[in-house]
Every structure is written in structure tokens, then in C-alpha cells.
Amino acid sequence: MENTQNKLNFLSWEEAKNKAKTFLKDFTIKEKIRLMYGSAMNPGNRCVGQIEPIKSGIFKPEKFAGIKFCDGPTGPRFQKGLTNSWPTPINLASTFNRKLIYEVGKSQGNEFYHVGVNVALTPCINMFRVPTGGRNFENFGENPFLTGELASELIKGIQSNGVIACAKHFIGNEQEKYRCASNSIIDERTLMELYAEPFYKAIKKGDVGCIMCSYNAVNGVYLFKNKLMNDVLKDKFKFNGFIISDWFAVYDDSPDSINNGLDINMPGTKSKIPIVGDLWFNPSLWSKVPKYVEDGLIAEEKINDTAERIISTMYKFSQIDYFPKKEFYSQSYITENTKKLNRKAAAESNILLKNEDNILPIDLKKIEQENKKYKIAILGIDAVKGEFYGQEPNFINFIIPIKSVDGHIANGYGSGTTTFKYIVDPYEGILNKVQNYKNIELIQYAKLDKEDNEDIETSVEKSKDCDLVLIFVQSISGEGYMKIGNSFGDRKDLSLLHNGEKLIEKVSDVNKNIVVIINAPGPVNMDWRNKVKGIIFGGLAGQESGNGIADILFGEVNPSGHLPFVIGKREQYPADIKDIQEYDILSTNLSSSEALEFKDVVNYDEGLFIGQYWFDKKNEIPIYHFGYGLSYTKFVFSDLKCNFNKELKQLEAKFKIKNIGNYEGGVVAFLYLTFPLEDEKYPIRVLKGFDKYFLNINEIKECSIIVEEHDLSYYDVDSKNYIMPNKGYYTVYIGQSSDIKDLTLTEKINIE
């Protein structure tokens, strides 16, 4: 594969803006307006939207080559299996590994680049506000600091290949239910410090080139015309790139959208998808813009600013001078190197939640030395391939009616998915490990009955005399335009599909040596957890999912994943999506006055207290804390020393980690702060630093985490700015999860 970066010439924003002014010098006002809306949504062309080229005239060269947009968070969409299907962002977040996520972004960017995509519609940086949220798997978890840090690495990786990343969905889009006709009520402090924070980091650390606004309204105004685009992104955060609408999210033809910060309306023209047809399209806006400019309702300077933003962003990422033509069918971009990286990310994202009696890892050499038969039962439909992965029509991707899931889940569904060229299921991954060991006998069984439930009776019989039972269970969610299993986008509940809870409980009656592997987009019911010895949360880990799980089970990879969300019972969470029901999402997004009528009001009354912060505030004990994750080895933290640099306004925490166990492995160090604030509306401890360290047996590492001024600040509503407290003590906590029992190092430091 051609090395993308050899031909790229990246510019500073200032250089790019100067070039854009020169480039646009001969453009008419109508040609500049033509940059501001798309021309089609046609998956048959392998991109989800585009801005058409602008020609100088008949038989004359193009003045502008156009822009092609493509989803998404797990790799290029609609590529007929030519590109990789990567672990979902929630899995990437579980690694807490900035370097790894940068490499995944870099590899994804290379794929987007070589198929001719200018703008990759990724990453999603909404918050894991409710445990049942349909698109939780497309995001990086419940914490704004974590999300901003990791999303910035993915952005930098993608954009290192000259592909513009698009951070989405700005803002307050944490559920699928009536997402196109809902009104999120969010107070200013919560909006700025929690939900806007990942966008701040995407801009300041990731230097993201594009941001997408969401379908919903915030505080009574739909985002496509909400002044938050100007006030927050462009003015306060100094965003230099361009803002696009979500697809079909411009509901009226007033000048408000352009005046309040929207730069591009997507997809801009009638959809070519039959099920969508004439819905969601209001073409009259763009025919009216020239008249709006003529009448002074839209300033010509606004049109110029938008055009310059679009062209300067393309210059910055070397897309004007050199960019390949669309080559969607040219070749496969699945290589041995991408498979290796994919597998590494999948394995590192697995989270070991329980390991009673050291039931894991499975020691194949020891079993062979004992020279007796060792029987492993592999139960559950999630252990084997189903009908969904591969070429059309059998893939979870777009608007395809599917009753349920009948095999291993490695992705959610909707626009954040890909077409799988292949998938390694867990049974295949396990078989590859044991096939050369004559004493290992695998007993695999999975069958769904007419009610779509596991055949529990047979599963129990097959597991009775086994030395080890591996039970694979699942749940799924996705974008809210179709129903699968227990979800219509958002999950109706936290139950496992196919009566998975009953399968675990019945098998546990006849065999105690059970390891449960969960493939799901987020928390599930775990009332059965005390009946098994081992639990792994595998998330939705992409095409190498089965190999990644097998690497953990057999100890080839020491688990180092940590939860990017808290796991509790549904009633313990501060927010929920009530009355999830089957509704036609298309009918809530018509280009008419009906679309402007709110069908749901979502009150963010919990303020800053989502996820673990809520559990801390209420002294609730979760099932598993944010950041929890076990290893096959043990680590000890010691010797914390903190220093505050008044000149740089930085806090540095130095400490040591020692691996005192019998395996080499990785561990995440979390830095939490208690702010010098007497404010009951502020969390008790906030995550403001983390890093991942890999240590050999008996190795000691000297570690350092630096907290910058912005992360030492809070949002002050009166001054409408981020400010540091001017006196008092921060309390610094260092440890292996958010649980106060794991935060073993602590020190107070004076900032005066």
C-alpha cells in the first residue's frame, strides 16, 4: 500500500487561510454558496455524501475538486469488505492507551485516504449518560476528560494521513429516542464542563478540522440553527475548521442556520435511498441564500467566512494540492499489519472483571503435562458466527429489517458500522489455540429455539462433566432506525439476549468452573456474577474479536483493559431513557413544521453527576467501578510526590509502580483531584489524568502525570470562562481505578 504521508504537505492554519483567500479570489458568490451544501446521499457510490466539483466552464478544468464524506467510527463504511472492521470506540477507550489509539486512527486514516474520502465522520464524542443509550458503543465512555484525551489521539492519527476528521455530535445527543425531535435541557455549567469538554479537547489537542452538529435541540433551539455553534465552538474555543449538519438535520429554510454558524448542510439534496425517499429534505434554503444575501439577511462576509473555512481546512491537510481520486473498488486494504494491529487492540480492550481461584489463564502446557483429558465446554450463540457479517445483504449496517442476532457480536448497528470482510469468532480463536494439544477436548454447543432463546437443557447436559465451561453471552444496540433483539436503537433494558441469564444460572447448578464472556455495548444485568468464577467484558471488538478473546483466555496477552463506564443496576443510574418503544424515526424528521415540534424533552437534571460521579455523590456501591480491571499479575504504587508550577500553572504528580506478580503486564494509573471548592454541585473527585504503563516481572517504573491549567480549572458561569481557584488545596489521588479503596496514594498540594 502506498505510504500516504510521503506526498502530504501540512500547513499551519495561518498559511492555509492565506492560501484559501487566494484560491477563492475568482469564485462568484453563487460558487461560494455551492460549497455550502451537498449533492447526494448514495451508498452505491460508497460514500455517504459529497459536495460536487465546481467547473470553470464547459471543457475547462475544475475550479474545485469536491469533497467526499464517509462514516465512521469503526472504519470506512460501505466498502464491500475492502477495508478493516476495527474495535468499536468503547473498546478503544477500554485500553486507556493513547499510543495504541493513535496507531488505530493512523491506520483508519490511511484507508479513508486511499479510497478517496476527504472527511471521515468520526469520532463520536457524546457522553455515556445513560446505560441503555443506543450509540454508547460509538463513544469513549462516561467521562469527559477520558473522551477528550482519547478522541484527540484518534483524530491526530486519522489527520496524519491528510484526511479530515469530523467530531460529532454537537451537542446533547445522548439517546436515540426521538433524537430528531427532542429538546435537551442543559444548564450552562453542565453543558460547558461536561458535554462541550470533549469538543474543546478535540479542537485544542486534536486540531480537528470538522465538527458535526446533532439532530436534537438544546434549551429550545435545534442545533442546526443554535448559536452555540458560533458562541462556543468558533468564538470561545477558536475552532478554525467547518461545521456540518448531521444528515437531513436542517429542518427549515430560514437564514438562521448560516448566521448561527452552520457551514455545510448535508447531504443537501434528495436521498437516493428508497426507504428515505422525499423525507428529510428541504431544498428551498439553498435556492433562497442568494436572495438572503442580496436582502442583507445573511452578510456576504458570512458566506466568505464559510468558504474560507472549508478551503483552508482542505489546504491545511494537503487536500487541494494532492488528493487521490475516489477508488472504492481498487483493492483490499486489509493487510497482515492491519490484522495484527486490529488483534492487538481487540485483546487489549478485553476487561477481566473476575478471576476467582485464578481460573484464568488456561495453562495449556500444564494440561498437557498432566497427560489426561481436559474438557472445555463452549456455550452460547455468541461464540460462533451468525448471518450478519460479510457481503450485502447480510451485514449490520444500514436500514435492513432484522429480527435478532444469531451469532457473535463484534459491532453495533447503524451508520457507525462497517461491512465485515471476515470475522474471527471466539470458537475459531479458541480452536486455533488448542488444535495441536491432544489432551484438550472442545465441546461446542449453541442453538436457538423458536422463541429465540438458547437451548438451555442441552447446554446443561453438555457441561456437566467438563473441567471448564466458557459461556458467551451478548447484548446489542445501535442507531435508532431499526429494531434488533431488545433494542430499538436504545436498549429497552440491560438484559442479555436469548435468555442468557438463565443459561448461566442453570449451567452453574451443575458446574462451578465457569467463565462468562460478555459481548455488549455497555452494562448488562449481572445478578448471576457470584455463581461463576470468571468474567470478561469483551465489548464489541471488531473483526479480530475472537482472536483477542482467545489471547486473553490462554494468557498470551495479559488483560489490561479497564472499564470506561461504571457498571451498576439500572435503577442506580441518575438518568434513564423512559418508555423506549418502537417508533418510526423517519417520521420524526420531516422537512416540515412537524419536525420542529418536540416529541420529547430530556432534562439533564443530574448536572455534572453522571456515571461514577453520581455513585460517589450518593455513596452508592456499584457492581464494578469506573476504571476497574484485573490483571494476571499484581502492581504496587508508591512514593507519590506532587509539585505545582505557579509559572506554568501545572501540577505534576510523580510516583512509582512495581510489578510484583508472575506475569509481565500493563496497568493504568488514574489521577483524580478534589478541587478546593465548597460546592455541592461539583463532583467529589474528578478524573484529570491517566496513563498506561507496561512492566516486566519485578520491574519498577518511575512515572509522571502532568495536569495542565485547563484541567485544573472549572467553568464559572458568571465570568463565562474556565478559571482556576486562586487559593486552597487540591487533593491528589493516584490508583488503579476510581474506587477510593484503589486510590492508594494521596497528597494535598497548596496552589497559592
Residue ranges and their predicted role:
Residues 1-740, 752:
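Glycoside hydrolase catalytic-domain context in secreted enzymes
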Residues 744-752:
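Intrinsically disordered, low-complexity regulatory regions in eukaryotic proteins
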